[in-house]
UniProtKB/Swiss-Prot annotation:
Its EC number is 1.8.98.5, 1.8.98.6. Signal peptide: none annotated. This is H(2)/formate:CoB-CoM heterodisulfide,ferredoxin reductase subunit B1. It is an enzyme of class 1 (oxidoreductase). It comes from Methanococcus maripaludis (strain DSM 14266 / JCM 13030 / NBRC 101832 / S2 / LL).
Amino acid sequence: MSETDFEYMFFLGCIAPNRYPGIESATYKALDKLGIQLHPFEQASCCPAPGVFGSFDLMTWLTIAARNIVMAEQADLDILTICNGCYGSLFEANHILQDNENARNKVNEVLSKHGLEYTGKSRVRHLTEVLYFDYGTEKIAERVERPLDINVAVHYGCHYLKPTDVKHIESSEVPKSLDGLVEAIGAKSIYYKDKNMCCGAGGGVRARNPEVALEMAETKVKNIIAAGGDCVTEVCPFCHLQFDRGQIEMKETFGREYKLPVIHYAQLLGMAMGMTPKEVALDLHFIPADPLLEKLGINME
């Protein structure tokens, strides 16, 4: 694929623009440097979260998701997401509607009242999937201006690779894509205990039982620190929130303090391509990235 083939409707989701706008801006800036063109959704809604909407009414979830997908269809583009939850919701809704004519007809009956029709011609893609499998780590490495000589703990999250009956991207037990992307920018992807464990944010756990959610996140943070990780990188703003804001909540709830920097891959990529930490908004995180920047010899500005 040539770089001219990389053009997408960019689905932001809710958490990035509302809680971590730096992830949004870093994605635009970093992908622009790679020659990947992103078009903003003009009237996107929540993806919506299937664990919330779908648990109450499956057709409502499918219809809202379909409306988002239709906007990409109208632009004749695929969707790119930077959030595992948005990816999971839109991908799975797309899969159901493509394969289930009855569901598709019911959804289109509602959409037709607004002059819309779902056809199923647009794909839903994840940032990690596109960068690793389509764009390629060799091309990314060629764009690196500042190799990041740090130990990075990769967190894949749950909804990027699961459920495996509909997502056939790579092994959900031994994934390699995000590790490869980290290595492409000069960093070392380290192994740590329970690497594939959930961060605790999803499935309604953070909302319903926050202490259990924090215990899950704390387990991962402790394992990463024990393995010598300089930071944790993820590809989901909700996971990012769980690790970043979560460390503040761990101190408030358990009285235990951690200072593990949390950085979305788009932010790491941007820094490796010469952007300052402030340009990728590391200064807006709850957990300061100072120890990481000191190791890299980079100033915030």
